[in-house]
Regions:
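Conserved helicase NTPase catalytic core signature
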Residues: 31, 35-174, 184-188
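P-loop NTPase motor core
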Residues: 2-40
Length: 230
C-alpha cells in the first residue's frame, strides 16, 4: 500500500510536543500489557516451563525490545526449557512438545500495522479526553486515507519500535542536524528511541524558529530528551 506525506495538519502544534509522545508511550505500554500475558506456563507432563516471575524479569531486563522481539525471546526460552526437560525422552516426544509450544507467544498472527495502531491511539485520546483536546477528527480522517504529516510519521516510527520491530537492522553511527529549532521536540524524542545507539549533533538557533507553534522556542525539552537518565 502506498502512503502520502502531507503538510502539517491543525493538530500539529499538539503532536509536536512531548505530552503527545508521552501519551503514545503510555498507550503502547498498555497495548503490550494487554497482549503479553505472562502467567506461569505449566505443562501437564513436563511441569513448569517458565514462571511468571521469570518471564517478567526477562521483560524488565530487555526494555529495548519490541513486543514481537520479546515474544521471540520468550519462545526461544520455552524451547530451550523443553529440550532440557526432554533430555532423557524419545526424540519424537521432544519434537511433539516443541511443536505444541511453537509460537506460544504469537501476536504477529494479528497482522497489526503501524497505521492501525496509530488510529487506535487517536481514538483512545478522544475517548479519554487526553491532552485537553478532543479534536482529532481531521487527523483520523487523513490517517485512514494513508496520508500522514511529519508528526504522524514520527508516531508510526515509535509504534514500529515498541510493537512491530522484528529484528535489529544496521543503524547510522552519527546524525548531524542543522536548523533543529524548526521541528517539534517529539521528533528528536522518537529519533533517540529508534536510533538508540546513534550519536547526534544538533545545531540551531531558537530565535530563528520559523514554525512558532510546532518548532522549538527554547532547548529545555530537547535537553530532557537527549540527556535523559537510562
Amino acid at each position: 500500500k502506498k502512503y502520502q506525506v502531507i503538510p502539517e495538519d491543525n493538530m500539529a502544534p499538539v503532536k509536536s510536543k512531548l505530552d503527545f509522545v508521552n501519551a503514545l508511550e503510555e498507550f503502547l505500554d498498555i497495548w503490550k500489557q494487554h497482549t503479553l500475558i505472562l502467567d506461569t506456563i505449566k505443562d501437564s507432563e513436563l511441569g513448569i516451563l517458565l514462571s511468571e516471575a521469570n518471564m517478567k524479569e526477562t521483560r524488565d531486563r530487555n526494555p529495548q525490545l519490541s513486543l514481537l522481539q520479546l515474544e521471540k525471546l520468550l519462545n526461544t526460552r520455552i524451547a530451550s526449557r523443553i529440550k532440557f526437560l526432554c533430555t532423557e525422552k524419545e526424540e519424537n516426544e521432544k519434537k511433539r512438545k516443541l511443536q505444541e509450544y511453537r509460537n506460544y507467544f504469537h501476536s504477529a498472527k494479528n497482522k497489526w500495522t503501524e497505521p492501525q495502531i496509530y488510529r487506535e491511539f487517536l481514538l483512545w485520546l478522544m475517548k479519554n479526553n487526553r491532552l485537553n483536546n478532543n479534536d482529532w477528527e481531521e487527523t483520523l480522517c487523513h490517517v485512514k486515507k494513508g496520508r500522514f504529516d511529519l508528526y504522524d510519521t514520527a508516531a508510526l516510527c515509535l509504534i514500529w519500535k515498541r510493537i512491530l520491530k522484528k529484528k535489529d537492522a544496521d543503524e547510522f553511527s552519527q546524525i548531524i542536524i542543522d536548523e533543529a529549532q524548526d521541528f517539534g521536540v517529539m521528533i528528536y524524542y522518537v529519533m533517540k528511541q529508534v536510533l538508540d545507539t546513534c550519536y547526534f549533533t544538533i545545531m540551531g538557533d531558537v530565535s530563528q524558529n520559523i514554525r512558532y507553534e510546532t518548532g522549538m522556542n527554547d532547548w529545555e525539552d530537547l535537553k530532557k530528551v537527549l540527556f535523559q537518565k537510562e
